[in-house]
Amino acid sequence: MNEGPNNGTDTYDYHLKTYGKDLVYDDFIRNFTASAWDPKEWVDLFADAGANYFVQVSKHHDGYTLFDLPENVTKRTSVALSPHRNLVKELFDASKKYQPHLHRAVYYSLPEWFHPDYKKYGFSIWPGGNATNPFINESLPYTGYVPLTDYVTDKIVPEMDTLAEMGTEIMWCDIGGPNRTTEFASAWFNKAAEQNRQVVMNARCGLPGDFDTPEYARYNGVQVRKWESNLGMDPFSYGYNRATPLASYLNASSIVTSLIDIISKNGNFLLDVGPTANGTIVDIEQQHLRQAGLWIKSHAEAIFNTTYWFVTPEEGENIRFTISPDAFYIHSLVKPSSTLTLSSPIPWVDGDSVTVVGGKMHGTVVPVHRLNNGSIALIVSKEVSAGDQYAWVFKIPY
């Protein structure tokens, strides 16, 4: 929209045919009603999915914030504009009341595509300056705009300070660019320490931060530095896309196997759900999240409070390893046959027991023996194979 006329895309053609040339981006703000939004339903869903934390978008690149701000900072907020609600606060409050074990966090974009005062800092596809109506090539006003002396000092700093005051435990920044994150982080970390709270920051705030964030991607091997893979349940969008076929959404099996692969390499898994304009999460996403959550809760000991096996995270395409202070865990990402053979050096010696984790056969002892070539063979009965889905986990207690 900064680039003026562009008639070479499907989006351009669809917009022109459906809405006409005079309806522009900011006109869609009024369609965002959140009329069916229930923050309790959301946090209950997150808990049902087996999550330990959630990251709520507080402001994306369009500069529309989902929380309240002083009028001398911006009026481009969900409080000043439709739906006239402080959505981040409502979600945080619901989490504290109904699912207090969930850690609360926010996503925050430092730059804004079209903020007039970002123009002097603009770079790449974040040039700042007013958007252009691509159909008639005219500059557009920036709804809710308040003139600022300096975008970084007068916009980024008070927004990040407000989110910190609201109690975010993760500052999940995006894009980077000009910032005053050093000063912000110093005050935020020190205050959290005084309150005996743990807070972290990703690597996109302008500092190296505490963890890296590959997007719609993951690492092939163990990373000693913590990382978090983020992707949408919709393979094409972090938002809601009505054109996405239901069969294309990430299913429970893919959620579980992705989670196992990621944690075996010292990562976390951040899974995006894109709500509709009325604040509901589509049924297919809810179904898949809850199905995955049943598996995650049943196998929690092999997932949470574990870390990577320093020798190797995996064996081939379908075996992953995790460890805890008390046990070594073998994860099979496919249903095992009658014999599961492992050639990797794992901490098993003659006489050690191996048991099933999770599923209908939880706690069942699995016979094990060492082959002549030094490999370990687990004898997996039909009952054990049939007793689980998505992934099969075996435990060697220390």
State where each predicted segment sits.
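Mature catalytic domains of secreted/periplasmic carbohydrate-active enzymes
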Residues: 1-398
